[in-house]
């Protein structure tokens, strides 16, 4: 049998013999330098609102690690060292079980939620993403102060969308915005608001810093009786 394959199987069996919380070490602010590696991927598993209020620059929001398929959708499944920000043992366990299937993606440890404040104290400003109501969005649109980035699928977008919205598929976020200056104010909309913090974290990392998430997503916008367009 191929020696490399044997070693791979052995590593997986050894990892599975341990409970996730036993083999994923807790990290502190003394471990922030680990995040400087080009292989590092920091997944912030806190809620969208907690993440948007303050996050470590470069992190990706994946609340509760409940939708790991999103990582594949945006090309983040690759040879990486994974670090987590969370206070949830269940989220750590879900992440550990998911990454067990990959030989070249290892969880290096987890930071508690307070690590964001530790980062701010030690390294400077944390990232933030605004949350706005549908009514606030309507006011900004009327004043031409924002561009709506719609994350829904093509069929839903064709049926109805916010006037002048730009559809940006998750697997081509920055490509869909090509030519749009990073200083542009973007208001993110998905079906009910659950995808926006994930997409927002990726856009923030790509240089777009004037970001807002529409609370309740497109469903809330419709409930407010605001204008719609069709393709």
Task: Label each residue range with its predicted role.
Residues 45:
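Metal-dependent catalytic core segments for phosphate chemistry
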Residues 1-24, 40, 48-147, 151-231:
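Rhodanese-like catalytic fold shared by cysteine-dependent sulfurtransferases
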Residues 28-33:
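Long, low-complexity segments enriched in small/aliphatic residues
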């Amino acid at each position: 049998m191929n020696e490399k394959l044997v070693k791979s199987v052995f590593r997986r069996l050894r990892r599975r013999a341990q409970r996730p919380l036993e083999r994923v070490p807790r990290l502190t602010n003394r471990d922030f330098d680990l995040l400087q590696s080009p292989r590092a991927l920091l997944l912030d598993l806190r809620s969208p609102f907690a993440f948007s209020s303050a996050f470590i620059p470069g992190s990706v929001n994946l609340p509760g690690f409940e939708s790991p398929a999103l990582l594949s959708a945006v090309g983040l499944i690759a040879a990486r060292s994974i670090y987590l920000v969370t206070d949830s043992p269940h989220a750590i366990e879900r992440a550990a079980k998911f990454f067990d299937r990959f030989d070249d993606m290892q969880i290096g440890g987890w930071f508690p939620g307070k690590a964001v404040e530790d980062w701010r104290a030690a390294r400077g400003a944390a990232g933030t993403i605004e949350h706005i109501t549908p009514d606030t969005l309507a006011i900004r649109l009327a004043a031409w102060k924002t561009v709506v980035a719609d994350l829904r699928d093509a069929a839903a977008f064709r049926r109805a969308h916010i006037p002048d919205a730009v559809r940006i598929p998750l697997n081509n976020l920055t490509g869909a915005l090509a030519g749009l200056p990073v200083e542009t104010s973007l208001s993110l909309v998905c079906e009910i608001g659950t995808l926006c913090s994930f997409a927002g974290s990726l856009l923030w990392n790509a240089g777009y810093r004037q970001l807002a998430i529409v609370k309740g997503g497109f469903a809330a916008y419709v409930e407010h009786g605001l204008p719609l367009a069709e393709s």
